[in-house]
């Protein structure tokens, strides 16, 4: 009887060991698969090099924004849908224009604490046929229809700098990451926290990038955390590493926690990412200069360097649409602007890539 029990325990122990080993192998295989799927972009041949515009840009669309005599402040952010252009300016006004003509549709500046009002408009995103506006001060999201009619709002409980609509709610960039609430926060459609990801201990002055989320033409959402060499793809299971940049000997150390540290190190660090068609574009800062890297995911072609400043239309992309990079000028401050147009305070440029 005793021998039978010992054998039974022995076989149970052997079975558990086998299951444990198989589990470890599965984790290792999954890790290997993730590493294989992670695309590393090597950025080392860029110093003192100009990127010829014809090498990366196929065409440029100009959208002259007709403001109809209304004052437009400096542009803070832009969203473009299939039929509309939305502009948030630093005078706290939200604008709607027709796309691609730039004809004026509506301007709102509903500043206050009442229903449908905001205090400090900060960021915008499109989703579910609505325009969502972030009010930084009140930690609120306001929803509008295509022509800026107010529909609804909700509040979230943490300071955020950027956000984007996803299928089952929103992703936020949390300014004050803690052990309990990490840098990227996933909420439902009512602003209730579902989960948070990507722990971070860096100081606030390390958050250089204005935009931390982009959506490609297929609807995939990508996440660029502040001061990061990695871009993450949003999935039902959370963020998964998708791309990584490697600056070789100029790569900054992982333990940098303040802007002073990175400035003193004179290493390169990313300040923005875009994913348009089959291109990954990142702008980065090194030794007092802003550089760009274009990576073609189809053929592996790379173009690295700084933008040609002799061109009439400046290449300073700030945002992206489904099919191009978006830059802008304030026409009153730009002597090279032609043709001059009445009631056109600003012009957007959509750069289409080769």
What are these regions (language model features)?
Residues 45-72:
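A short helix->beta-strand "capping" segment at the edge of beta-propeller domains
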Residues 69-70, 109-116, 155-161, 200-205, ...:
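Short coil/turn segments at the loop-to-beta-strand junctions that recur within blades
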Residues 84-89, 129-135, 168-175, 216-232, ...:
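Short beta-strand elements that form the blades of beta-propeller/WD-repeat-like
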Residues 136-182, 196-202:
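Asp-box/WD-like beta-propeller blade repeats and closely related beta-sheet repeat scaffolds
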Residues 243-264, 298-322:
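Conserved blade-ending motifs and adjacent loop-strand segments that build the rim/top face
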